[in-house]
Amino acid sequence: METEDVTVREQIFHDRVRETIICVLLFICLYILSHFILTHFKKSAEFVTDDIEDATVNKIALWLCTFTLSVAVCAVLLLPISILSNEVLLTFPHSYYMQWLNGSLIRGLWNLVFLFSNLSLVFLMPFAYFFTESEGFAGSKKGVMARVYETAVMLLLLSLLVLGIVWVASALLHHNTARESLYDLWEYYLPYLYSGISLFGVLLLLLCTPFGLSRMFSVTGSLLVKPRLLENLEETMNCAVFEEASLSRKLKSTNTCWISAHLEALNKEFLSVQSKRITLELRKRASPWQRNLVYPVAMLLLLALTAVSVLMVCFHVLELLFDESAMPRGMEDPHLGLASFSMLGSLGAAVQVVIILYLMVSSVVGFYSSPLFTGLLPRAQDTTLTQIIGNCVSLLILSSALPVFSRTLGITKFDLLGDFGRHDWLGSFHIVFLYNMLFAGLTSACLINTVTWALQRELIRAFGLHRLPLTVSRSTIPLKLLLANGLSKIH
């Protein structure tokens, strides 16, 4: 009996060591990926300066941002990893090489992401921001440690302020919780704070994702070679070349006084024309199949993914009306390998993973396309450290809310693990139902608006009516004129 107990303890120990090694390896890979991403966007001048102290502070802040971004990427991959792990165990239930893939590993990964998300949002990112802005207390010896002391004091004051706000909010919303002791900080107040942050992230996803789904068509179109009906590409390219040469001569000339006053605007115009000319050259060199096949296929794929997403949400709305099990809820043990989380089996699970990743990409596109957050848009080798911190915080809020967002919309049946499912508002039928209806309505409205304007714009460009004088209102152009102009070009 004693030998069996020792064997069980050894097995538990080896399982824990194996899970720790897997989580560490995954995090190292994501950290390296995040490091390359931030290195591509960071402003190198902030890290190579004559002031060694500022350079050291910026490097430490960049390390914290890299950690936060890696946690955000891991949060995005939580649901895809969980869904695919379940399908792998269903396909290979007795495989010796798949014994490491179990519910304990997935549950531990969810708990670690929840812990590090809290740590990054509440402590690391505020510390990084205050650290870069600090100079040390007046009269103290200058150095990195002086900045650390000032940052620690600022962070302590901010923590007390946030804790007070959370306590007041919990007391107003739930009268009994006002009697909670401060000893319940870790068990109650921090999860309550994260619940509020998660609710904010879910609401932000509700606004950004429909807008991003409509913007995905234009963003993808700008990256691909578009087919142009009835367009003289050679003529358009010659115009762009002549315009670029003219602007280049104006920039090189320093004799006229007005150039120095309008140099910045002229330079922006030159870069825009140059980018247009490069795009035209790429289109000219593109093969016929790339010019006429890739773009339509990509648009059809985006349209199919968007339509499937909206249909899944509409179907989930009907489920909410007739089935209580459709409500999002939390669970402690995922029970992997027992049944598929999709009625279509492995194919349906693969579709769920693709839809979840597609919605995340769309939400990021919508976030950076919105007027409120365009200033945060990172630029290669020209993003300040403050912007990097803001981007990391924003992406972490969006990604940490993605599991709750996907489960609330019914994209997947995989219930939320650990503290991700301990949000009070998840149990409210009215909130969940209204959320699904708003998402379906906003997405449909954005798509209808985008497709209508895009179709009108493409028709105008295809028939050459974009060259009309500005005094002519294009909205009043009759259909007969469109057809007549198009037929004359064909002949």
Curated annotation (Swiss-Prot):
<dbReference type="GO" id="GO:0007165">
    <property type="term" value="P:signal transduction"/>
</dbReference>
<feature type="transmembrane region" description="Helical">
    <location>
        <begin position="385"/>
        <end position="405"/>
    </location>
</feature>
<dbReference type="InterPro" id="IPR006876">
    <property type="entry name" value="LMBR1-like_membr_prot"/>
</dbReference>
<keyword id="KW-0256">Endoplasmic reticulum</keyword>
<feature type="topological domain" description="Cytoplasmic">
    <location>
        <begin position="368"/>
        <end position="384"/>
    </location>
</feature>
<feature type="topological domain" description="Extracellular">
    <location>
        <begin position="406"/>
        <end position="427"/>
    </location>
</feature>
<keyword id="KW-1133">Transmembrane helix</keyword>
<keyword id="KW-0472">Membrane</keyword>
<feature type="topological domain" description="Cytoplasmic">
    <location>
        <begin position="42"/>
        <end position="59"/>
    </location>
</feature>
<keyword id="KW-0675">Receptor</keyword>
<feature type="topological domain" description="Extracellular">
    <location>
        <begin position="174"/>
        <end position="192"/>
    </location>
</feature>
<protein>
    <recommendedName>
        <fullName>Limb region 1 homolog-like protein</fullName>
    </recommendedName>
</protein>
<dbReference type="InterPro" id="IPR008075">
    <property type="entry name" value="LIMR"/>
</dbReference>
<keyword id="KW-0254">Endocytosis</keyword>
<feature type="topological domain" description="Extracellular">
    <location>
        <begin position="314"/>
        <end position="346"/>
    </location>
</feature>
<dbReference type="GO" id="GO:0004888">
    <property type="term" value="F:transmembrane signaling receptor activity"/>
</dbReference>
<feature type="transmembrane region" description="Helical">
    <location>
        <begin position="112"/>
        <end position="132"/>
    </location>
</feature>
<comment type="similarity">
    <text>Belongs to the LIMR family.</text>
</comment>
<feature type="topological domain" description="Cytoplasmic">
    <location>
        <begin position="449"/>
        <end position="491"/>
    </location>
</feature>
<keyword id="KW-1003">Cell membrane</keyword>
<feature type="topological domain" description="Cytoplasmic">
    <location>
        <begin position="214"/>
        <end position="292"/>
    </location>
</feature>
<feature type="transmembrane region" description="Helical">
    <location>
        <begin position="60"/>
        <end position="80"/>
    </location>
</feature>
<feature type="transmembrane region" description="Helical">
    <location>
        <begin position="293"/>
        <end position="313"/>
    </location>
</feature>
<feature type="transmembrane region" description="Helical">
    <location>
        <begin position="193"/>
        <end position="213"/>
    </location>
</feature>
<dbReference type="Pfam" id="PF04791">
    <property type="entry name" value="LMBR1"/>
</dbReference>
<dbReference type="GO" id="GO:0016055">
    <property type="term" value="P:Wnt signaling pathway"/>
</dbReference>
<keyword id="KW-0879">Wnt signaling pathway</keyword>
<feature type="transmembrane region" description="Helical">
    <location>
        <begin position="428"/>
        <end position="448"/>
    </location>
</feature>
<dbReference type="GO" id="GO:0005886">
    <property type="term" value="C:plasma membrane"/>
</dbReference>
<feature type="transmembrane region" description="Helical">
    <location>
        <begin position="21"/>
        <end position="41"/>
    </location>
</feature>
<keyword id="KW-0812">Transmembrane</keyword>
<comment type="function">
    <text>May play a role in lymphocyte development by negatively regulating the canonical Wnt signaling pathway. May act as a LCN1 receptor.</text>
</comment>
<feature type="transmembrane region" description="Helical">
    <location>
        <begin position="347"/>
        <end position="367"/>
    </location>
</feature>
<dbReference type="GO" id="GO:0090090">
    <property type="term" value="P:negative regulation of canonical Wnt signaling pathway"/>
</dbReference>
<dbReference type="GO" id="GO:0005789">
    <property type="term" value="C:endoplasmic reticulum membrane"/>
</dbReference>
<feature type="topological domain" description="Cytoplasmic">
    <location>
        <begin position="133"/>
        <end position="152"/>
    </location>
</feature>
<feature type="transmembrane region" description="Helical">
    <location>
        <begin position="153"/>
        <end position="173"/>
    </location>
</feature>
<comment type="subunit">
    <text>Dimer. Can also form higher oligomers.</text>
</comment>
<feature type="topological domain" description="Extracellular">
    <location>
        <begin position="1"/>
        <end position="20"/>
    </location>
</feature>
<feature type="topological domain" description="Extracellular">
    <location>
        <begin position="81"/>
        <end position="111"/>
    </location>
</feature>
<dbReference type="GO" id="GO:0006898">
    <property type="term" value="P:receptor-mediated endocytosis"/>
</dbReference>
